[in-house]
Amino acid sequence: MTFEELKNEVMTQMENKPSCWRNGQFVFNYIDDKYNVARAVQYSDKVDCFYDDKNIDNFLKHAAKRIE
């Protein structure tokens, strides 16, 4: 899966995110639930968007590589 494909998928699903969640929380949980690679990106690749929304694109780039 390409970064662009994954980003489009996640951004489409983000319309359904709980209002109390930040975008990074949603992205992390969505990737973890659907693809089970979020923790590998967080701990092995050292990219965490759960606590920092500025890392969303970089997180998705690393996740896309792991999903391929």
What would you call each of these model-derived segments?
Residues 18-53:
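Acidic, low-complexity, intrinsically disordered interaction modules
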Residues 1-28:
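N-terminal acidic leader/helix
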Residues 51-68:
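Charged low-complexity stretches with an acidic bias
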